[in-house]
Amino acid sequence: MSVDLAFDEQELLPAVAQDAESGDVLMLAYVSEEAVARSRETGYAHYYSRSREELWKKGGSSGHTQEIEEIRVDCDGDAILYLVEQAGGACHTGYDTCFHRTLDGDIVGEQVFDPEEIYE
């Protein structure tokens, strides 16, 4: 890596996934150094689950993968941006993006799959 990344005390960084074509923000997750390395090696987004305390590939269960077109780093090196080609929905709730609701609770995104059919 030619840019120094400023991982936090848990050795994680926030990672935003953005659709490379539309510019839509798809999700926010966290990455470890290993997740970044795996993403670069495979060309597919990998993250670190804070609740399960493990590395995971986006779409590993659902098939809704994120093929990485570019990885960008913010000015402080403490967050990264995955520019991706999203296959299927990005959100585990079935929506195209995890940002599918307003603060008032209005649904503004599109549900593109039924999570009960995917995550049995």
From Swiss-Prot:
It catalyses: 1-(5-phospho-beta-D-ribosyl)-5'-AMP + H2O = 1-(5-phospho-beta-D-ribosyl)-5-[(5-phospho-beta-D-ribosylamino)methylideneamino]imidazole-4-carboxamide. It is found in: Cytoplasm. Catalyzes the hydrolysis of the adenine ring of phosphoribosyl-AMP. Keywords: Amino-acid biosynthesis, Cytoplasm, Histidine biosynthesis, Hydrolase, Magnesium, Metal-binding, Zinc. Belongs to the PRA-CH family. One of its GO terms (molecular function) is magnesium ion binding. This is Phosphoribosyl-AMP cyclohydrolase. It comes from Natronomonas pharaonis (strain ATCC 35678 / DSM 2160 / CIP 103997 / JCM 8858 / NBRC 14720 / NCIMB 2260 / Gabara). Coiled coil: none annotated. Binds 1 Mg(2+) ion per subunit. Homodimer. Its EC number is 3.5.4.19. Zn(2+) binds at C75, C91, C98. Pathway: Amino-acid biosynthesis; L-histidine biosynthesis; L-histidine from 5-phospho-alpha-D-ribose 1-diphosphate: step 3/9. One of its GO terms (cellular component) is cytoplasm. InterPro entries: PRA-CH, PRib_AMP_CycHydrolase_dom, PRib_AMP_CycHydrolase_sf. GO terms for biological process: L-histidine biosynthetic process. Its cofactor is Mg(2+); Zn(2+). Mg(2+) binds at D74, D76, D78.
